[in-house]
Each structure stands twice: as C-alpha cells, then as structure tokens.
C-alpha cells in the first residue's frame, strides 16, 4: 500500500509542473464558459441529441458537467422523490436509484483501494457507458465535457468499511476518511481511469463536508441532525499521521471533543450554561486548543487529496482542467469560509465552482441559523444571529422569517462572485459560480423563476467571472427557468 510520504511525493512531483502550465481557455474566442450539470438518466430518458439540443438552445450551454461518479441524488438520477417532476423527461420518480460509476471501470488503474473497483459500477442503466455515449456527440457540436464526481457513497459496497472514518468512540461511520490510503488510492485511480480512457476536457470533484469541529457544532444547513459524538476521524491512519507530524496529542484531541460533545448535547436540550453559550464554547476551546488543530488537520487532509488528484490528471494530460466544487456552507459558516483560502487552493485548481445558489440560499441559511443557535450562538435570538452572520460574511439579505420564502437575491450572487474573484486574483484559477435552477426547497418556500434565474446569471457575469455552472442537475430543472439562463447569456452577448 502506498504510504502518505510516497503519496505526497508522487503528487508533488507533477504538481509543480502542472501549476506552471496555463489552464486551457474556457471557450474558444474568449466566450464565457456556460456549464450544465447533467446526469446519465437525462440522456437515457430523453435521448442524447435531444438533451444537447435543449441545453444549447435554451441554456446557451457550451460545457457539460457530466455526473459520472456518485451515489447521491443531488447530481444523478431523476427529480428526488417528494418533489414535483419537471416538464421534461420521464414523469416518474426513479425509486430504484442506485448510483456509482456511470462509465466503464478499468481495474488496472485502481491499486490498493480496499474495495473492488468493479463493485462501484452503476447498475442503473445496464452496460451503458454514458461517457462514450455523450462525449463524441458533444464534441461534434463543439461542446466541452468535464466529468463531475463527488464524495457521496453507498454503504453496502463490499469492503467499504476499510475506507470509512472512525468516530470519537471507535465506531465506524459512513463518511470516507480523507487520510485513508485506500480512499486516496481509489480517487487517484478514478482520475487516472477517466483521464487515460476518455478524451475529456476536465474533471471536477466535490466534498460537501467539514471536519470534527464544524460537524459537532452543527455549523451547516440541516446541522441539527449532526451527532456530536460521531465526529472523526480517529482511525489508525489519522492517528499515525498525527503522531508523525507531532503537532497534537491524540488523547488530548479526544478529551477536548468529548467536552465539546457534552456542551452540544446540553445546549441542544435547552440547558443554558451559567456563563452563556459562546463563553462556554471559548472556554472549552482555550482548554483544548487541540480541537481547532484537529479541524485544521482534517482540512489539510482534504487539500492533500485535491493536490494528488490534480497532479495525477495533469501528469497524464497536461491541458486537462481540474477543479473543485466548493460547498454552499461557504455562504453560511464563518468557520468553513475560513478554510476556503483561494490563494493556496489555486495551486491545485484550474477552476473553482463556488456554490452561489441564490434561490435555495434563503432556506438553507435559515436552517443553518436554526442549528447554530442551538449550540455556539444560543445566546442570540435567531434574527440577531442572522444579522451577526450577515455582518461577518458581508451579506445583506432579508430577515430570518422572510428568507425561506424569498430566497437570496441576485445581489448575493454578484457580491460572492466579486469576493471570489478578488480572492483568486493573480492566480491561474478560473472562478465559475454555481447558479441555482430549481434546486429543491420545502413546499411553499422560494422557487426558481425565469426572471430570477436570468438575474442571477447576469449578476455573476457583471462581477467579471469567466463562466457559470447551471446547477444542480438538468433532470430537476423546469425548461422555462433554463431558458432564463440562456436569455441572460444572449442578452449580454456572451454566447
């Protein structure tokens, strides 16, 4: 098995050369990159040529972000059950959705992965290789194809426990460990398989997670469901790496997180600490600075994965574009945003998809505030906690009561796009905002509209970005809203 030192050495040997090379231009002739995230099921249900016709005619799309490795419904499959079906595609939910690798799996590229790579082949569409189906037809139209992969797994894959995290109490959890060599070897194998086997233009990978601190505090939308005792990772690989680096003592880390767990559980139950929530949190953090160090340790591991995947792809095909999907939590959590420093990240990024989902952003921010006012910010009423975050994050949107129904404005997209452009200034990295089109929200909450979509796309380009990615997936989008994006591109003469 490849150890961490060899893993980093392999990545570093090609990363330097790759970093010096200029990323390929977004499109010929200086036109903007107009991307669309789309899964295999859409081409199967509607026909490849028909889907490409719709994307080009309605959305002015010139780049496909083809979902090829995921076990999640966020980027693959039809509309999620419980949400209304769009006005195209089969009018039935795919309740038998499975997920996996929608291309051909070539085992020779996967070494020491802990699982059989063949077991990751998606069974949803039989023997169909969606990459071979779509890629030549896209190329014939002058469309680029970037393969879209994410850190979402099934838990019934034989041997998957070898890749999983271990929590505070020694239990296996469903997250994959960022420092696990089996996991890392699988990801670099996936990159090699895709880059050697197909004439692709790029690869994007996303991991919508944070480390133990953010998880324990529930510092994300939907965070009330987080279990502060199941944080990680404390597997043999993480502990060995930490001891080799010598920056923290593992037992001190565990003791600190157990104290944090007590605080979170008491806070969630409504028991106010004598000195309040935030003072108590800082007291724990001061007594156990290892808590913060372990959060950094996790993010360092994630960055090492980025660097290795980037280096592997560029060693095979120097002109391929490699980049990352940056989680929507970047718009909500100051803790998470602090880890998204674009200058060092640019060293292993040809592009960054910065999620700026305006329509669902209001609902998600309200959910985030609901979670963190049950832990760290419990001293504040929800509206005051929201205003505090608005000030910290330079966000100016509506009230806590309003935002689930109004969503965020196009101004949010423009401000975030400008901030990202400034953050990446002087680097080779292109900023491509992720634009929300019909991402599911709760009943009666804000829904996408053609005008709202048009405004968001225009706002992104007014900020000076070189491209946008229409998200999350074509199979949940209403055609009129997709046309709103295309109208913006054509009106601004960017197509």
Which role does the model predict for each range below?
Residues 1-15:
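N-terminal secretory signal peptides and thylakoid transit peptides that target proteins
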Residues 54, 115-124, 128, 151-152, ...:
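Polysaccharide-binding and catalytic clefts of secreted carbohydrate-active enzymes
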């Amino acid at each position: 098995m490849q150890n961490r030192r060899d893993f980093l050495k392999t990545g570093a040997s090609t990363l330097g050369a790759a970093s010096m090379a200029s990323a390929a231009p977004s499109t010929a002739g200086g036109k903007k990159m107009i991307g669309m995230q789309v899964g295999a099921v859409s081409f199967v249900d509607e026909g490849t040529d028909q889907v490409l016709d719709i994307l080009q005619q309605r959305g002015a799309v010139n780049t496909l972000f083809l979902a090829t490795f995921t076990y999640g419904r966020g980027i693959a499959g039809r509309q999620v059950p419980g949400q209304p079906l769009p006005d195209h595609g089969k009018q039935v939910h795919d309740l038998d959705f499975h997920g996996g690798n929608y291309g051909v799996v070539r085992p020779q590229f996967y070494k020491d992965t802990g699982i059989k790579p063949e077991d990751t082949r998606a069974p949803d569409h039989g023997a169909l290789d969606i990459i071979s189906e779509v890629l030549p037809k896209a190329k014939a139209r002058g469309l680029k194809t970037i393969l879209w992969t994410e850190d979402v797994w099934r838990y019934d894959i034989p041997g998957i426990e070898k890749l999983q995290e271990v929590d505070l109490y020694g239990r296996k959890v469903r997250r994959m460990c960022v420092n696990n060599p089996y996991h890392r070897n699988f990801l670099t194998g996936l990159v090699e398989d895709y880059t050697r086997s197909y004439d692709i233009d790029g690869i994007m990978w996303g991991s919508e997670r944070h480390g133990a601190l953010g998880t324990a505090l529930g510092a994300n939308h939907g965070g009330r469901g987080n279990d502060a005792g199941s944080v990680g990772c404390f597997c043999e690989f993480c502990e060995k790496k930490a001891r080799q680096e010598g920056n923290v003592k593992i037992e001190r880390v565990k003791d600190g997180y157990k104290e944090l767990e007590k605080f979170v559980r008491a806070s969630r139950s409504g028991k106010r600490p004598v000195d309040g929530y935030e003072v108590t949190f800082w007291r724990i953090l001061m007594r156990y600075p290892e808590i913060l160090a372990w959060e950094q340790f996790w993010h360092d591991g994630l960055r090492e994965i980025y660097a290795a995947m980037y280096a592997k792809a560029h060693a095979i095909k120097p002109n391929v574009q490699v980049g990352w999907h940056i989680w929507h939590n970047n718009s909500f959590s100051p803790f998470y945003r602090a880890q998204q420093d674009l200058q060092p990240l640019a060293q292993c990024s040809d592009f960054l998809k910065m999620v700026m989902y305006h329509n669902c952003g209001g609902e998600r921010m309200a959910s985030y505030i609901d979670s963190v006012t049950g832990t760290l910010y419990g001293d504040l009423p929800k509206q005051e906690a929201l205003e505090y975050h608005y000030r910290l994050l330079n966000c100016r949107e509506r009230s806590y009561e309003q935002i689930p129904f109004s969503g965020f404005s196009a101004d949010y997209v423009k401000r975030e796009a400008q901030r990202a452009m400034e953050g990446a200034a002087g680097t080779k990295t292109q900023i491509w905002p992720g634009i929300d089109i019909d991402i599911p929200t709760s009943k009666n909450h804000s829904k996408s509209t053609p005008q709202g979509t048009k405004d968001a796309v225009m706002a992104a380009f007014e900020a000076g970005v070189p491209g946008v990615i229409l998200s999350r997936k074509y199979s949940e989008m209403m055609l009129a809203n997709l046309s709103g994006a295309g109208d913006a591109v054509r009106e601004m003469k960017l197509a």
